[in-house]
């Protein structure tokens, strides 16, 4: 998580928008589980991984498109042979990825990333909750 948010702040300081990709649900056999993250910029992967392979590759391409459209989305990948969206993986599971557009000038994300890095440096616990409206960092009790 340190690398993701260090890179996010760096990109924001350079006035570069990004997309934060987070696995928000998984079932069956998958390369990575819920909570895995990567950060995507206009040229592709900046930091992190959500498991490599087709899921990561397609999420990077979708992330680059979302940067141009300046929007977020949720995308579900089926990692088994199917007739609707076969991506060629045979792991047997399903993965849902939240792709969150982050504008470089968004003060809420700047504050959140700084707070996360501060807590990591001080080894302070906390909960990161990503909701559609606004990210929030709360005390863990």
Residue ranges and their predicted role:
Residues 1-141:
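Segments forming oxygen-rich coordination pockets for charged ligands
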């Amino acid at each position: 998580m340190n690398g993701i948010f260090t890179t996010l702040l760096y990109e924001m300081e350079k006035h570069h928008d990004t997309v934060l990709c987070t696995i928000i649900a998984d079932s069956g056999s998958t390369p990575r589980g819920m909570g895995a993250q990567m950060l995507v910029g206009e040229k592709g992967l900046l930091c992190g991984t959500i498991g490599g392979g087709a899921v990561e590759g397609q999420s990077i391409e979708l992330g680059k498109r979302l940067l141009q459209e300046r929007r977020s989305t949720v995308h579900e990948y089926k990692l088994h042979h199917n007739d609707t969206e076969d991506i060629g993986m045979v792991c047997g599971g399903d993965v849902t990825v939240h792709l969150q557009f982050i504008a470089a000038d968004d003060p809420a994300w700047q504050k959140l990333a700084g707070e996360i890095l501060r807590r990591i440096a001080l080894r302070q616990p906390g909960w990161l909750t990503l909701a559609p409206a606004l990210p929030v960092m709360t005390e863990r009790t």
